Amino acid sequence: MADTLISAAKYWRLELHFNKGLSGATAEAIARERQTSVNPVALDAACLIIVAANERGAYPGVPGHEPNLSKGKTAADMITRAMKIIRDATPGSGAYPNEADYFEPDWQRSFWGVNHARLLAIKKKVDPDNLFRVHHGIGSET
């Protein structure tokens, strides 16, 4: 894993967060958590790897605050390369949707895992017109 992290870091900086799991939690707490929308593989993860970029606020048309699309595309490309190395080394792993790769190619499995079908059925029942959508949220693929 050290070689994987070093290879990925050649493209973009990474952070490892060891405070995200339920390590040491009671069996009861883990069982409760498995009933939520969180991908169950996340409950067994040793850490969360974050590869991210940020910029100051961009406001099209406001002088001095225009988005730098070239810089953004470069950052997205480098992050995608770093994430590919990590994904290739951790097949079947998942992601926490609130801090996940915006361009996640297999987001239904990565974010929701075995919960996706159950969550999609709930979504179709309570929001049959699919009015409430977010990028890579349940039902957004339609």
Per-segment meaning from a language model:
Residues 1-142:
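Soluble FAD-dependent oxygen oxidases
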